[in-house]
Amino acid sequence: FVKMNHSIADAAALAIFTPAGIIVHTGDFKIDYTPVFGDAADLQRFAELGKKGVLALMCDSTNAIRPGFTQSEKTVGKTFDAIFAEHKNNRIIVATFASNVDRVQQIINSSNKYGRKVVVEGRSMVMFISPKASK
């Protein structure tokens, strides 16, 4: 397993060693040098695999064909802080994927920082943030 970053916790790529050669399967990933939680992707390990020779690379990254780069997820947290600071007396409704636990945590952090209540809707969201989910 090779450490990767993505919107889900514990994302990893697989390096599969076969008699014919090394096959690398990344799954969907995002290179984030300053992730909200956890370590950055293990690019050193990818370099080591490359030096050994990779027979096939199967990878997927959202917006990979779009020029430029995607900012760190930490940028989103700063944006939430700015929104909460600007709208102290207004209701704020945020929609996100329940599986994007880094983003959900940043929403909760900003809510707490500005003394706001968090109301969770949706079965998946409730399941992901419930204390029971960690058991």
Q: Which ranges hold each PLM region?
A:
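His/Asp/Glu-rich metal-coordinating catalytic cores
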Residues: 1-135
